[in-house]
Amino acid sequence: MDETMRRTARAYTRRKFLAFSAAGAAAATLAACGGSTNAPTETPAAAAATKPAGTTGPAPTATNVPQSLGAASTAPAGSVTTGTTGTVSAGSAVAAPTKPANLADKQVLRYLDIEPPTFDPQVGSSPYNMPQIFEGLVTVNWTNNQIEPAHAVSYEANADATVWTFKMRPGLKWSDGTPLTAKDFEYSVKRIVDPKVASKYTAAAENLKNSAEIAKGASPDTLGVKALDDATLQFTLTAPTPFFPLLASTWSYYAVPKHVIDKFGDKWLEAANIVSSGPYIMKEWKHDSLQAFEINPNYWGPKPIITRVECSIFPDGTYLQQGLAAYENNEVDTAQVSASDYDRVVKDAKLSKELKPFPGSSTFMLHWDATNKPTSDVKVRQALSLGFDRKALIDVVLKKYYTDAPTILPPDIPGYNEAAALTGGVEKAKSLMTEAGFPNGQGWPADFTIEYASNATIKLALEFLQAEWKKNLGIDVKLDSRESKAAVEYRVSRKTQPFNGIFGQWGSDYGDPFNWHNFLFASKNEFWPTHWKNDEFDSIIEKAKGMTDKAARAVEYQKAEKILVQEAAHTPLYHGQSFFLIKPNLQGIYHPAILGTVPRGKYAYFTK
């Protein structure tokens, strides 16, 4: 997930590696967090438990994704298991939740976000509120972090996990009553690679057959996805992909309504036109002001208790600060607390009792142009990575709201490698700058600039780095902020144009290193266009992505991580974590480590 202006969840420092699926081997896992935390509120299914409303209980730290091949002997209640044929079926996963007692008469959930740059699942690099109205073949149950069937009731892989076949749930409908079939999913997934759609996230389809040929001009119709009939969808992959169910759960693989797109063109996403497949329909979209959602009468699953979801839209540079004020004024029911407001909230007698921590799987980084002077010199890039006080950044500037990130992969992702970190600190940085021809900053370009999406916390961090580099290395660095959409456009435009530095964040879309190393940093993808290329790195991650031995695969990604960090085209700064205020009578609010930024109405409810 492109974390430009997205809220990231808490990254705990316990070095817990989460397993991932391997064809014919162990079950995959979806990274929930790097350690353990508490789930602050209950869901309807859990509301009948003995603990009082509003208390906390342990949240899962890691959970099994349904196996591609082989079978687990047991599974948690409500989870999905595989049979000996490799088939995954719905089982009890779609049972209606127990209706909680003492429900409030009014069930309207209010929160806030920024104006999404796009609401098209095949275009955007972050889901925003899309999961309120769209759903995929499989989904992640936020109450237990299990991958569960959604529009598909079952799926199976062939012997080497290169072909995945999904069976559709019978009787599916779009919110307007139009039948929803496997052909809708085929159409939608092919949109990811269609140049006319102009996706900012084409790497989501990289594993599908012919994706590379399509990037070179072949027809999107040749992509490795096909509706064998209305009830059967088949994906053909370029290599063994044991983690494919994780990919299929992401927003890029949501079905979108071809009949509406054909009718309305670019206006299909407006509230008056859009139809949906998820638990809600969009009733209003007052741009830069409000998105409102109400229950979808044609949703296949249990109807939510929350009857209306209202997402107030705030300016992207100040929405956290304004959101806190809105929460205190009882204008929203939950709001994230920014790092700059964290101290005040913790010291407030009332607010501190309503503050809840959540796990995370993300990294905030600086990205350097590896072909443009002076950062074309690896010594300069390493010096910038070493030339500041990390402890002061985390403890003083960010007030321990975030955790230090000397390496790029978060601790919860297989391949995490503490030993990959650069060493030597400020003294080494000074020496490297001298070797690179910039002793005490002499000869440094006066217009060296870092671009970033406007955000108060990011601004604080960059101003600290700016001062540190001046003090320690004698160099001047300019800062240039842009609103979120413009920042994304700037990043994309750098594929063919030089730059100095870009601040950017990434949060895991699923708990696998492919979503980091292959997705972001492979020279053929380059999400951040640093123009850095390392043949050894590319070779390692290409080999590792389809390996079925999970331990050996993690070792390969650890090797890749060391190359990535030592080459320093990307400077990791800190791992994300988040704290949310939640009204005492609001239950069922979850923010998982992965894709957990926006609360989902389907789990929530209010008590009296």
What are the language-model segments listed below?
Residues A22-L30, K286, G387-G415, A456-A467, ...:
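Detector for C-terminal structural segments
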Residues G35-T37, T63, Y111, H287, ...:
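Ligand/substrate-recognition segments at binding pockets and active sites
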Residues A93, T375, T403-A436, S454-L460:
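Structural transition elements
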Residues L112-P131, H151, T178, P240, ...:
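A structural "hinge/loop" feature
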Residues N141-W142, Q146, S219-P220, A231, ...:
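Gly/Pro-rich hinge or "lid" segments in bacterial periplasmic/extracellular proteins
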Residues W268-A271, P297-V345:
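Ligand-site clamp/hinge motif
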